[in-house]
Amino acid sequence: MTKKKSNDKNNNEKIIANNRRAKFDYEIIETYEAGICLTGSEVKSLRTSSVKLDDAHAQFTKNNELEIVNLHISEYKNNAKISVHKENRPRKLLLHRREINKIISKISKDGLSAIPLKLYFNQKGLVKLLLGIGRGKRNVDKRDSIKDREWKINKQRTFKNFNH
């Protein structure tokens, strides 16, 4: 028997890393899917999920290109010492020109930040980065989001107990 193909895009994605802290620290307004320029040893290292997205952010260069900085990809352990990559080097993001222009205008004019949300392999096996454009939350906003989350949990508990 043959398996039916699913129309769901997320079935074949293998998530490498999630930036869970970003959704707590930033109010995400828009997201973009971007490719990323990597060397062979970096891709091998990503297959073992040895990456840190915590301090990473996107910035634009003098050539009006976007690059991700402070993305820490650890050294591949089984690699020859000749082709070792730098762990924290800036990596170019691959987007269409109109998307880059949109992001750059939002970063420079509106005072928003570009934060990586998720790093994953897509259906074709290519490394993709989900880039979020957002505004930083203040402590009051963080407390409000915690209160909302706790209220939803308590509401679900009461409805669950009420139905039984």
Predicted feature descriptions by range:
Residues 88, 95-98, 136-164:
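C-terminal end-helix/capping segment
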Residues 1-34, 39, 147-164:
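Intrinsically disordered, Lys/Arg-rich N-terminal extensions and targeting peptides
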